UniProtKB/Swiss-Prot annotation:
Belongs to the universal ribosomal protein uL24 family. GO terms for biological process: translation. It comes from Chlamydia abortus (strain DSM 27085 / S26/3). One of two assembly initiator proteins, it binds directly to the 5'-end of the 23S rRNA, where it nucleates assembly of the 50S subunit. Part of the 50S ribosomal subunit. InterPro entries: KOW, Rib_uL2_dom2, Ribosomal_uL24, Ribosomal_uL24_CS, Ribosomal_uL24_KOW, Translation_prot_SH3-like_sf. Pfam families: KOW, ribosomal_L24. Signal peptide: none annotated. This is Large ribosomal subunit protein uL24.
Length: 113
């Protein structure tokens, strides 16, 4: 499996789709399908049938997953492109480079979910 810079809890920027330009927090990562669920993005309406608990039935809004290639990590409110940098001791780090300066983001092995 390819490394992914997006983890649960990260703030991401949506690059493509109906919600292009929106930002949201990653709720879950579906690594097998290369998809992520982002809070407030790609919201779908689901109808719940009538039952004893719900005599009238109801509609609920749920976030549907979107492909990971359609999101990019948001750092300082803007989409950021990250690269992997290997330090002298062999540790791999996600590195943000902009305007020729490098900024460490986090370790590659550090996963929140």
């Amino acid at each position: 499996m390819k490394r992914r810079s997006v983890c649960v809890g990260d703030t991401v920027y949506v690059l493509a789709g109906n919600d292009k330009g929106k930002q949201g927090k990653v709720l879950s990562c579906l690594r097998e399908k290369n998809k992520v669920v982002v809070e407030g993005v790609n919201v779908r309406t689901k109808n719940i049938k009538r039952s004893q608990e719900n005599p009238k039935g109801k509609r609920i809004n749920i976030e549907a997953p979107i492909h990971i290639s359609n999101v990019r990590l948001s750092i300082d409110g803007a989409p950021a492109k990250l690269s992997v940098k290997v330090t002298e001791n062999g540790r791999e780090l996600w590195n943000k480079s902009s305007d020729g300066t490098s900024k460490l983001y986090r370790s590659v092995k550090e996963r929140k979910g």
